[in-house]
Regions:
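Short glycine/serine/threonine-biased micro-segments
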Residues: 4, 80, 103, 217, ...
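Conserved AAA+ ATPase small/helical "lid" subdomain
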Residues: 188, 194-250
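AAA+ P-loop NTPase catalytic core and its hallmark functional loops
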Residues: 1, 7-8, 12-203, 207
Length: 256
């Protein structure tokens, strides 16, 4: 059991593939090859990992849990592996999310991994080669990853600079799956499925997204993601006038 109960149907129906990414990810999982998801914000990277956790669990008839960590500039290696905490009886060690995933098996997903501090890279390197081990210096312990463990990371290449980028020594430990904005036809289906609006409105929103993305070559710094188009559709579905829905969900979200 994944603990999804009420949302299991939602997870099952929530991802529409754009290429062979499901087959590639499943193969990587079977062969214990770490996966790097790269692409712009709002192109479905997180949704894809959620779906694959469900998909692989269904195929294997056993739970393959997903442990997601939203990386940020203050995230340290200790946040991932664990730390000592003080309680009434003294100090005790509490495993971090990465350690729990390594021990019990499952997918550990580090979202926007380049945002984390550099010491986190040192931690994940031994987990992403033939060793598949996690070393916890504070405990003096070395853990071999469970057979069902897989490391998955994501990042947005468009946001990176010389100070925040994935080193080649890190990149080449992963197979990479690229996520791009879907075709207008597919995006129409996604918007319709996710927001519940009819095909005509979904098509108009997909067309709007495509036109806005063409403006990124003319000074617009951020493209309209599929996510914000879905948000606009949800507002329209709930009775907000279409132009206003697009203004608050799309225009004001990507411009200042």
């Amino acid at each position: 059991s994944l603990g999804l109960v009420g949302s299991e149907m939602c997870i099952r129906d929530s991802y529409i593939p754009t290429s062979d990414e499901i087959k590639v990810f499943e193969s990587a999982y079977n062969q214990k090859v770490p996966v790097l998801l790269k692409g712009p914000t709002g192109t479905g990277k997180t949704r894809f990992v959620e779906y694959m956790s469900w998909y692989i669990s269904e195929k294997r008839k056993k739970s393959v849990p997903l442990v997601t960590v939203a990386c940020h500039e203050d995230l340290t290696a200790s946040d991932l592996v664990g730390r000592y905490l003080i309680d009434a009886s003294g100090t005790k060690w509490i495993d971090g999310p990465l350690t729990r995933a390594v021990k019990s098996g499952g997918i550990c997903y580090l979202d926007e991994v380049v945002e984390a501090r550099k010491d986190t890279t040192v931690i994940i390197h031994p987990l992403t080669d033939h060793r598949r081990i996690l070393t916890i210096d504070k405990l003096g312990e070395v853990y071999e990853a469970d057979d069902d463990f897989l490391m998955v990371v994501s990042y947005n290449p468009g946001y990176q600079n010389a100070l925040k980028d994935l080193k080649q020594s890190t990149r080449q430990r992963f197979v990479a799956i690229e996520f791009e904005f879907p075709s207008p036809e597919l995006e129409t289906k996604i918007i319709q499925s996710e927001s519940g609006v009819d095909e005509k409105i979904s098509d108009s929103l997909a067309s709007l997204g495509e036109k806005i993305r063409n403006l990124t070559d003319h000074g617009l710094t951020e493209a309209a993601s599929t996510r914000v188009l879905i948000y606009a559709g949800k507002l329209i579905k709930d009775g907000i006038e279409p132009r206003r829905a697009c203004q608050v969900a799309v225009t004001w979200g990507i411009t200042d």
